[in-house]
Design a protein with these regions (language model features):
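The feature captures the beta-strand-to-loop junction immediately N-terminal to the Walker
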Residues: 64-66
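Conserved ABC ATPase signature
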Residues: 163-167, 171-173
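Short coil-to-helix segment of the ABC ATPase nucleotide-binding domain corresponding to the Q-loop/switch region
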Residues: 125-133
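Helix-to-loop junction immediately C-terminal to a conserved catalytic motif
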Residues: 79
């Protein structure tokens, strides 16, 4: 009886450990006690207070808040574009808060796609070239072909060879979004990505992003 009970206890413990490992491995991003303060003159303005966040692979979350509530600051922190005043950020089981800018940049380049409401396209590059450049810099095979496939999904097949100045605001934003996900990042951070789009295009972009996450 003792040996059976002991075996049961050991098995239960092993199962519990195994489940915890699975849960930990499936966590893509983790924030622990994140605080962010900006200093303006003699005052410290607190933007984020004790933020805890867990995002699992293939999970979609929305951060809702008033203007100035810190949503964009949160994206900047997660994307490694800014450092927290205190707290820790883990990406794929690696703490990134203590890494150098170059190390964080390397992680971001390969694993994180950021879509800002305000974006920049290279003026003298066509739509295809703007997207393909990201792939070229990361040694993708056939970057032009991949860029065209992606832009086609965004309804821009007829705009492949147009410069940004020849595109509407909504079309420019679609190019910027296509560029952000061209590397097939593990994590997409979107700061009001459809803010400049009409209803029809907003729905199309949202559906594409959700489909991408499921894939």
């Amino acid at each position: 009886t003792f040996s059976i009970a002991l075996a049961f206890m050991c098995t239960r413990k092993i199962i519990k450990i195994f489940i915890n490992i699975l849960l930990f491995m499936s966590t893509l991003l983790k924030l622990k006690k994140i605080n962010l303060k900006y200093q303006t003159g003699k005052d410290n303005i607190s933007v984020l207070k004790n933020v805890d966040l867990n995002i699992k692979k293939k999970e979609t979350i929305s951060v809702v808040g008033e203007s100035g509530s810190g949503k964009t600051s949160l994206i900047m922190l997660i994307g490694g574009l800014e450092k927290p005043t205190s707290g820790k950020i883990f990406f794929q089981d690696q703490e990134i808060t203590g890494l150098s800018e170059d190390e964080v940049s390397e992680i971001r380049k390969k694993n994180i796609g950021i879509i800002f409401q305000s974006f920049y396209l290279i003026p003298n590059y066509t739509a295809v070239e703007n997207v393909a450049l990201t792939l070229e810099l990361n040694n993708f095979k056939n970057p032009q072909k991949e860029a065209k496939i992606l832009l086609d999904r965004f309804g821009l097949k007829h705009r492949f060879n147009n410069l940004p100045s020849q595109l509407s605001g909504g079309e420019q934003q679609r190019v910027a979004i296509a560029r952000a996900i061209a590397m097939k990042p593990e994590l997409i951070l979107a700061d009001e990505p459809t803010g400049n789009l009409d209803t029809e295009n907003s729905i199309m972009i949202t559906n594409i992003l959700f489909k991408y996450v499921k894939e």
